[in-house]
Amino acid sequence: MKNFKISTIIPVYNVEKYLEETILSIIKQSIGFENIQMILVNDGSPDNSEEICLKYKEMYPENIIYVKKENGGVSSARNKGLEYATGKYIHFMDSDDRISKNFYKKGLKMLENSNISVVCFRIKMFDAARNYHNMDYRFKGGDKIVDLTKDYQYPLYHMPTALIKKELLNDLKFDIKLKISEDVKFMSEVVVRCKKIGIITSELYYYRKRQDESSAIQSSSRNLSFYFDTPKYSFQYVLDLAKKYPNMKKYLQNAILNDVKWRIFECSFGILNDNQKKEYIELIRDVLLKIDDEVIVAQKHVDNSLIFRELSFKYNKQIGAKLKVNEDSLCFNKTKIFNLNELVLKIYCLDIENNNLNISCCLDCIYNSKYDIYVKSNGKYIKCNKSLHKDGTSNIYDSDFDYLLPFYDISLDLEKYSELEFYIEIENKKYKLNLEFIKFSKINNCKNSCYCENGYVVTHFNNVISIGNKKPLFINIKYMFELFKKKEILPLGLLGLYLLTYPFVRHNNWIISDRYDCAGDSGEHLFKYIKEHDKKKNIYYALKKNSKDYDRMKKIGCILPINSIWYYIKYLNAELVASSHIDGFINNPFGKKSIYLNAFCKRKFVFLQHGVTKDNISGWVGKFNKNVNMFICSSKGEYDSIINIPDYMYDENIVKLTGLPRFDNLFKGNIKEEKLIALMPTWRSSLVGDLILGTQDRKYNYKFKESEYYQFYNGLISNNKLLDILKQYDYKILFCLHPSMKAQLDDFEKSKFVNITFYPNYSDVFKKSKLMITDYSSVFLILHI
């Protein structure tokens, strides 16, 4: 029998598109393939993966073992592969990933020259993402050996990134009950045996983030095993293991915490009923109760607000009122949470209006705060107005208790103040706050960032906001140089174009839009109205250039192709932007880079709406997230709901009861009723793929056809009895799929009696239809017309 240095075990399931790339990355390893044993375990794959396995088995019969078994999940496949492994070291690799050329060479060198049994490698995403793993801090400082009993914040739970000495795995097996996080449990058992691991930065494990989200991890939250089996059989097991190995307790608790924290605030519950949701919440809370506060507080690269929320969830109470000061630190249960001299005040709105400097800010690390914020200027302390609101953050315990973020507002006469510092008062002592400029603030955290308005120039330095009258051109040049040093190429380029074209471009542009790829909503009707009644207005309609409506709208007026350079320049020079939609790229087309351009973008934003708001959507469209300047409503009830729900943070100066511009179109034209039934269900957030960056489109969800939603509606429109009745009475159904689900359109069965569309002319549909059927979409309100 050949003595291999490494046995690579690869479970194979439904990966014919990726498998060859994985195999080749191993064959091409610099240590030579003759030193590698590859074990391909076909876990009942339904595609043509077997042909690829057999092809390479035939090419390398001495190196490759091919095993075929019934589907049992990745754990059973890895266990089966271990039975055949003869190499000195084991590598469990996923069948859609790849490794860098010297991956094994570098790993073997560290393993054989050091007294360790495990090394792990840096992770970089590829395919649908290009970033490093969110815990990349572990790989700062180069290659090293870490003693996990002393430095526990190096969680190792992504199995394919590890190279392990085989003798360490003698009696270990993967838990076949686990479909998700099986490697967390397995790797925890491994590290308590070795206690030291090698960290390798210079070679990479390339983790595929699939475009279609079809990998097990990407689709995990649509699987009940994710909610129940993983907490019960993986998390709880590891925390019990911590009791048996006291010197590894902090490591094991931290490893579980790194998985659990994302579940608390980034989890969808679309597949859970109310009882299941309650059970899941208690499972996660029970996990947190077994993790020491000290470990929660000590997390690396985690915002203080997340730590605060984890503790609140753990103890199921508002801990804001329970905090105590001890030696200039805020403490909970005698555990120091943060140093009061390091508190950060986040300024999310800063602008000038009517010669007043208006500042809105939040202290997002102390929820349910009883503390006041002061502005210090000219030797005096001015108290800010305080209000408590939900911050719009998704979390799994919204129904358990109010979870409120303190917001502060102040308006200052620019003639009276020149320098501003912010302080928090706690137990009769004031602490100076560090400032961070976010979201809609007209100045940002860059050195030389400035905001010029009405002859005033606002700058900041060393946590002091200054108001003066420096020459803006000189400051802007210094600011651009700062952007260059920070390698912020996109905002630098746009700012350069903005300044170059400034003398030649009008600065009173109005930009109107609906969806990025379709017209036909309130934006179009407002655009037409203005073109007819105010021909001097410098107005544009924004639309994707390949839209079916582009040529039609071009005949009405000037069109701005969305995402073109000209669109960005016009947007920066716009006086007003109005849209029936409020997706990020519409009211904030510069995305995360907008903070660098806010000082130059002076536009007001009007939200026209594309329907009637019947639910509380403050977490999505409230001031903290969208900061609109005018919010159009259709009815008194809707208007009152926006005004009276404090979490929107909009008052009567912003919310206006005018009706939607598209409403008038319902009474125009001579369209007659037809024998048409409009079937118009709303969408489900848990059943759609991720948004495609910079669009309103979503990726295809390969699990969609397994949902009750699909099976019900597809069963309805393909029901033979219904189709016979439609034929008998000469009726047709127009199935209007919500635009957010248009990627799934081809999943539904079509017939001569059922037409399926995702973005019809809604006004025409309402006028033509004899009957409209919906579930709980606000479109039902049209029935009252």
Cite the ranges covered by each PLM segment.
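Nucleotide-sugar donor-binding/catalytic module of glycosyltransferases
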Residues: 1-233, 237, 677, 782
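Conserved catalytic-core segment of nucleotide-activated headgroup transferases in glycan assembly
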Residues: 246-247, 253, 519-531, 661-747
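Nucleotide-activated donor-binding/catalytic signature segment of Leloir-type glycosyltransferases, i.e.
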Residues: 60, 743-759
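Non-catalytic N-terminal targeting/anchoring module and adjacent flexible stem/linker
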Residues: 1-5, 30, 246-247, 251, ...
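Catalytic core of nucleotide-sugar-dependent glycosyltransferases
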Residues: 206-211, 218-246, 268-293
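Active-site and donor-binding regions of nucleotide-sugar-utilizing enzymes
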Residues: 359, 392, 499-501, 507-666
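Catalytic binding pocket for nucleotide-activated donors in carbohydrate/polymer assembly enzymes
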Residues: 651-652, 746-751, 778-785
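A donor-sugar binding/catalytic signature common to diverse glycosyltransferases
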Residues: 607, 758-785
